[in-house]
Design a protein with these regions (language model features):
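Amphipathic, hydrophobic secondary-structure cores in small proteins
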Residues: 12-74
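Short, charge-rich amphipathic alpha-helices with coiled-coil/heptad character
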Residues: 1-9, 36
Length: 74
């Protein structure tokens, strides 16, 4: 095993850990948004901010997952 392989493995573990953390936060935001809309919260600004954060998390997760996908030379 080469040093570069170890670094790549460490990077992959870090990326997978970050993806997991972001997915948990995304899930928590979804639950919070659902709760606010269920109780009929009139704070649309807060709901909008939560939805925006949720979209940002989804985009970040997609970027990180793309880093784990090997490049295919066509």
């Amino acid at each position: 095993m080469h040093i570069n392989d170890n670094i790549n493995n460490i990077e992959e573990i870090a990326i997978r850990s970050e993806i997991l953390r972001l997915r948990l936060e995304h899930h928590d935001l979804e639950a919070a948004i659902d709760a606010l809309t269920t109780i009929g919260s009139i704070d649309q600004l807060q709901i909008g901010r939560l939805k925006k954060r949720k979209l940002l998390l989804r985009d970040r997760i997609a970027i990180l997952e793309d880093q784990l996908t090997p490049d295919i030379i066509a």
